[in-house]
């Protein structure tokens, strides 16, 4: 398009000098514009100038270019994971290993999660915890490389203690992402892992007491006999999907507590990242149940160019939202780690007001934040030259006025 209208028949022509002055004006405008562009320190400053009056999404408008108002990064290398207390031993093990630069981020995550598996952190990780209805402990785990974006996981793994180790074997010795159940156990044995009973005297006694109490509480709904007062065996009762209260028929009845997972992100001094999770799942679960822990993007997720996320909580709900994938993509859009965590939690709470969740997010610089709902969530981190691990307490989000 011409920068000025062409002269049409019947229109009055501008004087020749006027046309020349318009041309000169355009040339001068172009010269000054180019000078201004060259004076800008970067393209981002030009964009900021051009759109200074534009309205940005609130989570982005509050965050400067680096995603935080002031950096809380301890420096690299760094390890960060869900929960404090007994989980701090895992943080320390992974961090101390990373001080040797020959230890990769994947190595650190595997070591940290396996520490919790061996220590039976809080009874929610490793053998002898969270037995299912048949009194058996099964394990879920995953590990992810933030450079290749490849992950390996195991679900409902039976009779193998080192679930995170088997997950890494899936990553490194197959082109698959997940193996499950008895055949995952077979794979583990052929890769040198030892099959053994994961039941302990404590877990057996706990399950026996649960059965003596009428198998209460449990995760069954819409069955005969009434799962609210009886043990099985259960058969399904009719559910009318056309009824107005269909959604109500699918609600839980007050299931058992206990959804803790170790979910860890490691940042190597070189900037490479890895993430992983390990858990024995929900106590009294229906046999065969798989939680969010081994699901890439739900239990954890990492991209070395952006950051990583770890999650814990009610995995049956959380895996429907892929909160860690959402949080890392929010980092990519410019949110701070804390804002990204809060956004991921709010998306879940909007649909499930009572969901218990905890999200920890860290960007590639080591800046971190967390959010939770339904409980006070904690996360632990150690990095740079820190002499000890710090545990951060995160109160549940106040979302009462949002719904």
PLM features per residue range, with description:
Residues 1-48:
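Classical eukaryotic N-terminal signal peptides for Sec-dependent ER targeting/secretion
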Residues 1-6, 16, 20-21, 26, ...:
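Generic low-complexity segments that are intrinsically disordered, proline-rich and/or Lys/Arg-biased
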Residues 32-37, 47-73:
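N-terminal signal peptide
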Residues 60-403:
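Alpha/propeptide regions of enzymes that mature by internal proteolysis
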């Amino acid at each position: 398009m011409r920068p000025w209208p062409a002269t049409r028949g019947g229109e009055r022509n501008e004087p020749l000098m006027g046309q020349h002055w318009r041309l000169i004006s355009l040339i001068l405008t172009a010269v000054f514009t180019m000078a201004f562009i060259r004076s800008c320190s970067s393209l981002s400053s030009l964009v900021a100038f051009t759109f200074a009056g534009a309205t940005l999404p609130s989570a982005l408008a509050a965050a400067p270019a680096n995603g935080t108002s002031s950096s809380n990064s301890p420096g690299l290398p760094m390890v960060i994971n869900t929960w404090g207390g007994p989980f701090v031993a895992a943080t320390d093990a992974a961090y101390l290993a990373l001080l040797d630069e020959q230890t990769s981020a994947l190595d650190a995550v595997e070591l940290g999660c396996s520490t919790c598996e061996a220590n039976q952190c809080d009874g929610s990780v490793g053998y002898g915890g969270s037995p299912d209805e048949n009194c058996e402990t099964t394990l879920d785990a995953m590990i992810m490389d933030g450079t290749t974006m490849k992950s390996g996981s195991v679900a409902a793994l039976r009779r193998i203690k080192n679930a995170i180790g088997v997950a890494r074997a899936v990553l490194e010795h197959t082109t698959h992402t997940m193996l499950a159940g008895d055949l995952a156990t077979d794979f583990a044995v052929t890769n040198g892992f030892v099959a053994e009973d994961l039941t302990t005297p404590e877990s057996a006694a706990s399950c026996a007491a649960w059965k003596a109490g009428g198998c209460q509480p449990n995760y069954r709904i819409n069955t005969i006999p009434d799962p609210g007062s009886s043990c099985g065996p259960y058969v399904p009762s009719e559910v009318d999907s056309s009824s107005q209260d269909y959604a109500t028929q699918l609600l839980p009845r007050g299931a058992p507590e206990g959804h803790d997972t170790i979910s860890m992100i490691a940042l190597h001094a070189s900037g490479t990242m890895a993430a992983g999770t390990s858990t024995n799942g929900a106590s009294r679960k229906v046999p065969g149940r798989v939680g969010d822990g081994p699901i890439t993007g739900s239990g954890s997720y990492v991209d070395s160019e952006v950051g990583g996320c770890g999650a814990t909580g009610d995995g049956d709900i959380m895996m429907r939202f892929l909160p860690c994938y959402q949080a890392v993509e929010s980092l990519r859009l410019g949110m701070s780690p804390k804002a990204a965590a809060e956004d991921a939690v709010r998306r879940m709470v909007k649909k499930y007001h009572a969901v218990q969740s905890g999200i920890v997010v860290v960007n590639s610089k080591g800046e971190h934040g967390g959010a939770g709902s339904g409980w006070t969530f904690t996360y632990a981190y150690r990095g740079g030259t820190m002499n000890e691990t710090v545990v951060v307490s995160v109160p549940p989000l106040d979302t009462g006025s949002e719904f």
